[in-house]
A protein has these predicted regions:
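Active-site neighborhoods of metal-dependent hydrolases
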Residues: 128-162, 168-189, 204, 237, ...
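Divalent metal-coordination and catalytic microenvironments
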Residues: 9, 24, 29, 50, ...
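Short, well-structured alpha-helical segments that form the helix of a local strand-helix-strand
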Residues: 372-379, 445-453, 468, 472
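Alpha-helical scaffold segments that flank or form the walls of functional sites
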Residues: 66-142, 161-178, 201-209
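N-terminal metal-binding scaffold of metallo-dependent hydrolase/deaminase domains
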Residues: 1-41, 462, 483-491
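Divalent metal-binding pocket/active-site signature
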Residues: 166, 174-234
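C-terminal cap of metal-dependent C-N hydrolases
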Residues: 9, 313, 400-406, 411-412, ...
């Protein structure tokens, strides 16, 4: 007898092949049979008439490292069909790190990951994994190379000594041994922004020819995005490793329509020469990260205390104004998005809370300040722990990336403890189905499902996931594509998506018509499992 039988639905198996009618049988958390199973007995039967049956969706780029410990974790994810997520992205992982720079690291992670119980930030992934509560969905972890560097040398040093590299190498190897799925880079963030290309290659040398995925938030995603792709291809060639470029985009109207075709062409040529290169994209024209990210890399030298001193110094602020007006050598988000395109979504001091949800331009007008002075004063007041949403990308570029066979879908969901998160936390996967499939026809339903299942699974070597095939994990969604709906907005983002009839995690029903199961069937995914 089967544990579970899903009958009467249209199967979209994740491979991109045309949809077909079939039943699916589940036994022991695995897919046991696909076909006409009308004669089979099952302990539980699910009628999928009028619905499609797909693999569970996989988001390999979230920042839920600390959110996993929140009592309501999983609802936002399951409601949009997610059965697997991966954290530790952009070089920013909650582990591993020790005591020497713990306070600095926790402060730096705060706008991205939210409030962190120091007991959950551990020196080893082998300690972090057992500390996790029961999980409602499967969770994997990348080890953040930025966290490794900060643990070895803090945020103050721009150039490392051999002893620092030795510590980074040892910690990286240990994290991979403990089960990290790969390594993530955040070259747009301190302290990794201080690496030269050759220093970066040396820091990553334990990965050489090991077939371990490297994901990267590139050094620049605006006017320098093509050069940044070139840099990462240099790294991939030098180390002979699989490269996955995170949230590919071209920030700033001046770069729309030109930079992304060039970047995709570079990736396609690299793929043709034999490199294992892929990328991902989120389906929104706005991103979300630390407000600190508007500053040029050299302004970040010395760590947060040094940054605050510079922000308070009139001469340094004048120099910053000149850098932002010129926009040379860094992702000048203030210029690329405009002060009216940068919204404050995570503020924590009571006197600043009235500005929550306002743009920098709006706050500047309310306070009678110049926008840059307003921004700098807020950063000082909040000790740089501010989250923003910045509107800077082109929907046409997003469509170009989605059409590429190299791309998969991600959310880049951040989890600030207060304020208004980006609606992508709650709605990325329904947004793709609703907007880019149903409304705009950028992708077929089969193509979209592949970008949410098999392609992300392949990028991070999740061999038992991403498709409906006998022997693979029974992570399965049942839904009517016409009913899938993203309910959240930028003004009111914290709303669960609608339309998932069933979400099945490891053969266990986790969600049925908006009702969440009390069972926790999620597992911790480790490299090599």
């Amino acid at each position: 007898m089967l544990d579970l039988l899903i009958f009467g639905g249209i199967v979209i198996d994740g491979t991109g092949r045309a949809a077909y009618r079939a039943d699916i049988g589940v036994q022991g958390g695995k897919i046991a049979a696909i076909g006409d199973l009308s004669s089979c007995e099952a302990a539980c039967r699910i009628d999928a008439s009028g619905a499609v049956v797909t693999p569970g969706f996989i988001d390999i780029h979230r920042h839920a490292d600390a959110a996993l410990f929140r009592p309501d974790f999983g609802k936002a994810e399951l409601a949009q069909g997610l059965t697997t997520i991966v954290n530790g992205n952009c070089g920013l992982s909650l582990a591993p790190f020790g005591q020497a720079h713990r306070a600095e690291i926790l402060s730096y992670l705060y706008p991205i990951c939210g409030a962190i119980d120091p007991r959950t930030a551990t020196q080893r992934l082998s300690d972090y994994f057992p500390s996790l509560p029961p999980l409602p969905l499967h969770v994997g972890m990348l080890v953040g190379a930025g966290t490794l560097r900060a643990d070895a040398a803090g945020y103050a040093l721009t150039h490392l000594e051999e002893a620092h590299y030795h510590a980074i190498h040892a910690a990286m190897e240990q994290a991979l041994s403990d089960g990290a799925l790969g390594v993530s880079l955040g070259l747009g963030y301190a302290p990794e922004c201080f690496y030269t290309t050759q220093e970066l290659i040396y820091a990553l040398s334990p990965l050489a020819a090991q077939n371990i995925p490297l994901t990267v938030h590139m050094r620049q995603e605006g006017g320098g995005v093509v050069d940044s792709v070139e840099e990462m291809l240099t790294v991939a060639r030098a180390l002979r490793l699989p490269l996955h470029i995170s949230h590919l985009k071209a920030m700033g109207k001046e770069n729309w329509g030109t930079k992304i075709p060039q970047a995709l062409s570079l990736l396609t040529r690299a793929r043709d020469e034999g490199l294992d290169v892929t990328c991902d994209v989120y389906p929104y024209t706005a991103g979300s990260t630390q407000l600190l990210h508007i500053l040029p890399p050299d302004f970040l030298e010395g760590g947060i205390d040094a940054v605050i001193r510079r922000l308070q110094d009139a001469g340094a602020r004048r120099a910053l104004r000149q850098r932002i007006e010129s926009g040379v050598g860094f992702d000048d988000i203030a210029r690329l998005a405009g002060w009216d395109g940068i919204y404050l979504t995570g503020l924590y001091r009571p006197e600043n809370l009235p500005y929550l949800g306002s743009s920098i331009a709006q706050v500047a007008a309310q306070t009678g300040k110049d926008p840059l002075d307003c921004c700098c004063d807020l950063l000082v007041s909040e000790r740089c722990e501010i989250t923003m949403i910045d509107f800077m990308a082109s929907e046409e570029d997003i469509a170009r990336i989605l059409r590429s066979p190299l791309s998969n879908l991600i959310s880049d969901a951040t989890y600030p403890s207060e304020g208004k998160p980006h609606p992508r936390v709650y709605g990325t996967f329904p947004h793709l189905l609703e907007h880019f499939v149903r409304e705009k026809g950028v992708l077929s339903l089969e193509e979209a499902v592949k970008k949410m299942t098999l392609l992300p699974a392949q990028a991070l070597r999740l061999k038992a996931k991403g498709a409906l095939a006998v022997g693979l994990d029974a992570d399965i969604n049942v839904f009517d594509p016409a009913q899938v709906h993203e309910t959240g907005t930028y003004e009111a983002p914290c709303q669960l998506a609608q339309g998932m009839r069933y979400v099945i995690v490891g053969g266990t029903v986790a969600l049925h018509d908006g009702v969440f199961s009390e069972q926790s069937a999620g597992t911790i995914l480790k490299r090599g499992n």
